[in-house]
C-alpha cells in the first residue's frame, strides 16, 4: 500500500459533546501512529480511517472506496466515560472482523482470564441493533423477522435484551442462546458460556435453524477477534497500523 488513508475527525453535535471529544482523541492517536493527515468528514476522500458512524463519519464511510473502521473492542473494551485504556476494534472495509482465520490463543488469554462452562438456560435472548446501527444498516424489521425465524425451530421463550431493559448481564444466567445481528453483547455472553448466533453477513456465526443444537466451538472465534483489536497506545505507537497492513 503506497498512499496513507486520511483520518476523518468528527464534528460536535452540540457544545460539550463528549462523544465528539472521545472520537477525535482516538482518531488523533491513530493518525499519530500512521503519520498521516486528519480531515473533517466533508474533506474525506476515497481512502479513510474513522471512528464510529455518527457525527459525519458514517457518510464518509459510504463515500469511500476503502475505509478502516474503529469502534468499541470485542473484549476488554475501553470505557467511553473513562480513560480509554481498553481495546478498540479496527477493520478494513467492514464494521467488524469476520472471526474467521487461524490465530494463536495468547492474546485471548491476555484479555479473557476465564471462559465459563456451557450454560443450558431456558430462554433465547435477542439482542437487537442500536437505533443508529439500525438506520445505518437498514435493519428496521430485524426483530420481527428474526423472531419469526426462531419460532420455526424452537418453542423456547424469547427475551429482547437492550441497554434499557433485560440487560445482557441480567438475563444471561438463564439463557439457552443469544441471537443478534452483530452486537458485541453476544461476545460477552459467549465468554459466559452461552452459545451465540450472529446474522450479519460480515460476522455470521451459527445458524438459527440449529438453535436447539447451537455451535459452541468458541476458541477460534475469540482468538481471531483478540488479534483484531488494539489499545490507544497501540494506535499511537504505530503497532495497530503495522499489523493492519499485513
Regions found by a protein language model. Give the residues of each.
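Leloir-type glycosyltransferase catalytic cores
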Residues: 17, 79-121, 136-137, 153, ...
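Donor nucleotide-activated moiety binding/catalytic core segment of transferases
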Residues: 39-43, 55-56, 60, 148-152, ...
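Hydrophobic anchor at the start of a short beta-strand
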Residues: 5, 36-38, 67-68, 124, ...
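Conserved catalytic-core segment of nucleotide-activated headgroup transferases in glycan assembly
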Residues: 119-164
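Structural motif
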Residues: 46-47, 123, 176-177
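Short loop/turn segments at strand-loop or loop-helix junctions that form parts
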Residues: 8-13, 70-74, 121-133, 200-201
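N-terminal pre-catalytic "stem/leader" segment of glycosyltransferase-like enzymes
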Residues: 1-53, 57, 132-133, 240-246
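A basic- and aromatic-enriched beta-loop-alpha substructure that forms the phosphate/nucleotide-
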Residues: 53-104, 184, 189-191, 196, ...
Amino acid at each position: 500500500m503506497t498512499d496513507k488513508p486520511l483520518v476523518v475527525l468528527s464534528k460536535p453535535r452540540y457544545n460539550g459533546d463528549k462523544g465528539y471529544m472521545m472520537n477525535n482523541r482516538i482518531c488523533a492517536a491513530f493518525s499519530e501512529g500512521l503519520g498521516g493527515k486528519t480531515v473533517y468528514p466533508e474533506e474525506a476522500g476515497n481512502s479513510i480511517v474513522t471512528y464510529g458512524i455518527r457525527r459525519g463519519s458514517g457518510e464518509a464511510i459510504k463515500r469511500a472506496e476503502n475505509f478502516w473502521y474503529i469502534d468499541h473492542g470485542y473484549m476488554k473494551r475501553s470505557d467511553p466515560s473513562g480513560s480509554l485504556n481498553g481495546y478498540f476494534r479496527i477493520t478494513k472495509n467492514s464494521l467488524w472482523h469476520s472471526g474467521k482465520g487461524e490465530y494463536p490463543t495468547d492474546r485471548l488469554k491476555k484479555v479473557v482470564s476465564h471462559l465459563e462452562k456451557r450454560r443450558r438456560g431456558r430462554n433465547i435472548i435477542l439482542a437487537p441493533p442500536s437505533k443508529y446501527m439500525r438506520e445505518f444498516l437498514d435493519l428496521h424489521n430485524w426483530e420481527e423477522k428474526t423472531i419469526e425465524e426462531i419460532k420455526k425451530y424452537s418453542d423456547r421463550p424469547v427475551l429482547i435484551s437492550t441497554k434499557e431493559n433485560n440487560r445482557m448481564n441480567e438475563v444471561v444466567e438463564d439463557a439457552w442462546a443469544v441471537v443478534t445481528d452483530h452486537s458485541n453483547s453476544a461476545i460477552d455472553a459467549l465468554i459466559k458460556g452461552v452459545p451465540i448466533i450472529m446474522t450479519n453477513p460480515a460476522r455470521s456465526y451459527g445458524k438459527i435453524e440449529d438453535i436447539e443444537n447451537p455451535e459452541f466451538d468458541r476458541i477460534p472465534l475469540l482468538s481471531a477477534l483478540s488479534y483484531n483489536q488494539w489499545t490507544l497506545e497501540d494506535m499511537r505507537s504505530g503497532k495497530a497500523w503495522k499489523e493492519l497492513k499485513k
